[in-house]
Amino acid sequence: MLGCLLERISGQTYEEFVQENIFKPLGMNDSGLMSFVSIIPRRASGYWPGSNGTENADRPDPRVGFSSGSLYSTTEDLLRWEEGLFGGTVLSLASLRKMTTPFKSDYACGLHVNRVNGHLMIEHDGNNIGFNSDLAYYPEERITVVVLANLNGTVTGEMTRALAAVAHGETPPIPSVHKEISLSKEVLTRYAGTYQFPHYSLKMIPEGNHLLVEFDNGGTLAVFPEADTKFFSKPWPTQFEFSKNEHGEFTILTRYQDGAKEIGAKK
């Protein structure tokens, strides 16, 4: 919607506007709107986890994402973007303040704003078929961390926090290793049901020796047990943990992803 408004007001295509008003002024010479027709030098191929190991990812029409994504860039160019955005080149300081002010939760205008290990962090991740990314800025120390990956399932958020810890002179967290165990059908069945989170709901469906997570947007995710109450995704940095309520019933579900957690309740 915003991309369509931008085109109507400016009289330019979205690609023309972004190139003329953002990429060229900031010197982002290796960034643009993705195309599988044009030859883009040094373009990375995308991969995803398959049943027999890593596979070539599908190549969706980049026009589908339009102004919500479908851009290509480099770590150097994204550093230039952060310097331009937080240096007052892209937006006025008043607009930047509005953009980075959280509303109700830690989410501001397209950015997550919270404290991680005592450091103020302004961050957002991104993903597309075959690619994952994470971009974080620590305004108090003026530290930027950019992580780009051409493999779905890469824990870019965890990598960002580890690199930020090094930049802050701290010890980076040790990545967790998940080991699958077997649970009885009876144990898996007690977790079946619909769970309501603040902004979405999901269903837990027992399937074989794992649970199938069915999101309200139609997406699904298989999660495997590593303990009686803990489950993890093999390709994605997502874990779930079931907890009992005051009556001793498993009705509380906590979702962990990229260092953040959300708590939902069984309907």
Task: Give the residues covered by each predicted segment.
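Short, solvent-exposed loop/helix junctions and linker helices
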Residues: L71-T75, G153, K185
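Histidine- and/or cysteine-centered catalytic micro-motif in compact active-site loops
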Residues: D125, A149-N152, E207, D216
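Short, surface-exposed loop or secondary-structure junction motifs
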Residues: M1-P139
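Peripheral terminal and inter-domain segments
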Residues: H119, E140, G157-K267
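Short linear motifs in exposed loops
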Residues: D58-R59, N132, A136, L148, ...
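Extracytoplasmic and endomembrane cell-envelope/extracellular-matrix remodeling and assembly machinery
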Residues: I129, V146-N150, T154-R161
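Short, well-ordered loop/turn and helix-capping segments at boundaries between secondary-structure elements
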Residues: M28, G87, N150-T154, A165-G169, ...
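Short, well-ordered beta-strand elements
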Residues: E123-H124, D134-L151, T251-R255
